[in-house]
């Protein structure tokens, strides 16, 4: 075992899984950690790790009366978001990565990564985290093992995924396939060298090898770059698995809607980051008799059931939400879940009484805070107190409105799929697709103004197909074709209806054309009534939109004429939009599905 005599925990590994042991040994030899710890996921282990993180200054323990068993972390200012320019899909063939992904030949990338990872865990503990995405007792559980040198990652993964001994035992007993997910902060400690509160490296690489189903992440301790079960596995690698196995891994919420007649419907919805996905998943309806429960706020895996129905499951165990804008006024259900504790906050502000705060959390701004950079802050300060991409990480089972179906490995049958972006003009409040193919066209041309969740310019309109642009693990044209072709597996009577929504449309005066938040239930109600054949609509060149009277406005200070204005299809705006869509589709070249070209041609004809 070479130099591994100094790694005593390897001999006492709690598994006999040959591939796993060989991989752990290979990584230990490469990264040279001081010790190896197999994560069991227990309370005692979590307490020990969080105590150590508090002592190291990585975590700050919050006031136990207001935020029980909760902590705040503050990252290096250069490590605050996903790094899309350093995220790679290293497929064997460059064409399979497509134009939306960065690519490097796998052998060349592996050589580069081995150089970076060599000795990268020196002076640190190497944690081995067995995890499962979805349910352990699912028909086809999807396993992973993350190796990391960050205890913050262990504590966060414990919230976000099902981890620990039960998972490892199942991997061992069934000799299961697992996705190896390797993560290092890239901050080795030499003997006697003092650590910093947030170790990271200026050189960051987030790399996926789709054919071998593996992930290597170097240099970042932040969220999606480091919690590898999340975007890296559950979307980028899982989308490739889904392509090969005939299912879908999508950037979507799942909600359960119950009508006053006690009829239930399940809806999934795809929105780019910071477009209200968590708020919709945790919706408090403002219309009488309608009830919303949630099954998930970020990632949905969908498969066809035995009768050709499309079924959805949330593979995650926690919420990893953008904090700013989440407040008692806008999302009380999220706030109640957070108030139960057991949460980790990253890059929020601290109140003087040991609590946390961020923009939009309360109506009144505290008179004094410590901002996310550790500086004294008052409402007169120039910069926001919390980073725009600051996060809360909270167990999903703390949500009072969690639907019991969340715990079902079979998932739920979808009645509708929503696609939504953030556009000030052009896109109506809600549009019903003409059919499945037209709905995929809507999803493929989804667009939004960029947000703080990704590093780079803010406020530029970018196309974001199915809200998956940063997360498609293979060629984007092949991905859209996979969506188109899936309908062949479906029972056409049971295919979900597709709708395009835009909560962010502005009026001519510059205000929002729609109140949003809890009132979005009124749009969901219209969509459900369309499924049931009960609501009126107007046919437009882009699809069906509500009549002014068909949206329930009871109790809302809004007129049918204002609804008509919010769903108006403006020919001049759509002439510009058509040109923009043509430019977008040109990127796909040969891989653009013929069905989508024909949808575009049809739209052109209808717009005249």
From Swiss-Prot:
Keywords: Cytoplasm, Decarboxylase, Gluconeogenesis, GTP-binding, Lyase, Manganese, Metal-binding, Nucleotide-binding. CDD domains: PEPCK_GTP. It is an enzyme of class 4 (lyase). Mn(2+) binds at residues 231, 251, 298. Substrate binds at residues 82, 222-224, 273, 389-391. It catalyses: oxaloacetate + GTP = phosphoenolpyruvate + GDP + CO2. The active site is at 275. Binds 1 Mn(2+) ion per subunit. GTP binds at residues 274-279, 391, 422, 517-520. GO terms for biological process: cellular response to glucose stimulus; gluconeogenesis; glycerol biosynthetic process from pyruvate; oxaloacetate metabolic process; propionate catabolic process; response to lipid; response to starvation. Its cofactor is Mn(2+). Pathway: Carbohydrate biosynthesis; gluconeogenesis. The keyword Lyase applies. Its EC number is 4.1.1.32. InterPro entries: PEP_carboxykin_GTP_CS, PEP_carboxykinase_C, PEP_carboxykinase_GTP, PEP_carboxykinase_GTP_C, PEP_carboxykinase_GTP_N, PEP_carboxykinase_N. One of its GO terms (cellular component) is cytosol. It comes from the Bacteria. It is found in: Cytoplasm. One of its GO terms (molecular function) is manganese ion binding. Gene3D superfamilies: 3.90.228.20, Phosphoenolpyruvate Carboxykinase, domain 1, Phosphoenolpyruvate Carboxykinase, domain 2. Monomer. Belongs to the phosphoenolpyruvate carboxykinase [GTP] family. Catalyzes the conversion of oxaloacetate (OAA) to phosphoenolpyruvate (PEP), the rate-limiting step in the metabolic pathway that produces glucose from lactate and other precursors derived from the citric acid cycle. This is Phosphoenolpyruvate carboxykinase [GTP].
